[in-house]
């Protein structure tokens, strides 16, 4: 019994250390060799939830325009999250300047409203960060 408790405590400690290491390694902003700026909202959007949990994204911008929004790993229900991809929610900001993308009113995808809102809010936070309109780092 004592061994089982120690084993569980050891595994729990390892998981906590791994989780904290992962979150520390997240780079919020990086610039690729071709000049593309990639904003990762894992940290700045850590309190933005979809239906089940946080919904971080990476926003790629080149020349001040959104090139791509990509959903990062999350715990949203796969079938509902697929509705977002099929509904092209992630493409809603492509081709827009960061300023225009931030101003754009994007509708949630029917059937995946909470997940949509999480993505939309993460994109907004990421764009604010890119434009220097936030104190979060």
Q: Where on the chain are the PLM-derived regions?
A:
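Flexible, solvent-exposed loop/hinge segments and secondary-structure transition points
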Residues: 2-10, 17-137
């Amino acid at each position: 019994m004592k061994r089982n408790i120690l084993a569980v405590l050891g595994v729990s400690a390892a998981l906590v250390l791994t989780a904290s290491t992962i979150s520390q390694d997240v780079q919020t902003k990086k610039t690729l060799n071709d000049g593309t700026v990639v904003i990762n909202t894992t940290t700045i959007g850590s309190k933005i939830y979809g239906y089940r949990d946080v919904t971080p994204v990476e926003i790629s911008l080149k020349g001040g325009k959104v090139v791509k929004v990509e959903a990062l790993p999350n715990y949203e229900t796969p079938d509902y999250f697929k509705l977002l991809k099929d509904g092209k929610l992630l493409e809603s900001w492509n081709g827009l300047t960061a300023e225009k993308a931030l101003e754009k009113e994007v509708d949630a995808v029917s059937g995946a409203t909470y997940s949509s809102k999480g993505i939309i809010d993460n994109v907004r936070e990421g764009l604010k960060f890119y434009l220097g309109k936030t104190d979060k780092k």
